[in-house]
Amino acid sequence: YKADIKIYDKNSALSTHSIKETVNSSNIIFLSVPTPANIDGSIDIRIVDSVLSEINRCQESDSIILLRSTLIPGTTQFFSEKFPKLKLVFNPEFLTERNANKDFINQSRIILGGDKKNTNSVAELYNWRFQDKVPIIQTNFQTAELIKYMNNTFLATKISFMNEMKMIGDKINVNWD
């Protein structure tokens, strides 16, 4: 593999190429955009939709697009039906903001959801990059999306649990040091 990395960002100061150049000269596109929470707890997928619309308009190549953002189960299928010419794979990131580079290099597993032909192509890239040392789970869109949601929920549950234990400990004079 030869990695010729191109970066497109809406902030042109961070871009190395236009979106059209990036999309049409890439075999695999990593798409990481925010999916902020709405007041009711749902997620806002308008940014993902907008970027996929733009890619759909300018794509002349056969690139695979990795959706890395947190999406509720069923969302990638929705986008796959809305943009049938796009080859989508849901590939959630399990990165912390503080250690994103380190977390990417030291992944415990890679989740790929989508059409088997597309996930196989992406798995080849990851196997090459990580020298077959990181387990790769290939599944469908919905399962991959649920794995990501379960991971996020489990982390939140652990934090809530420890906060509760701290409150109990404080009431009974537990020494946390």
Regions found by a protein language model. Give the residues of each.
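A structured beta-alpha segment of the ubiquitous adenosine-cofactor-binding alpha/beta core
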Residues: L14-T22, A37, E54
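Structural motif
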Residues: F30-S32, I111
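Rossmann-like NAD(P)(H) cofactor-binding subdomain of soluble oxidoreductases
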Residues: I28, P36-N99
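NAD(P)-binding Rossmann-fold cofactor-contacting core
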Residues: Y1-H17
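Short, charged/polar "capping" segments at the starts of alpha-helices
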Residues: S12-H17, P73-T75, K117-S121
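A short, aliphatic-rich alpha-helical micro-motif
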Residues: K20-S26, I105
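Internal alpha-helical scaffold of NAD(P)-dependent oxidoreductase catalytic cores
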Residues: D4, S80-N91, T96, A100-D177
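Active-site flanking residues adjacent to catalytic metal/cofactor-binding acidic residues
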Residues: Y8-D9, L67, N163
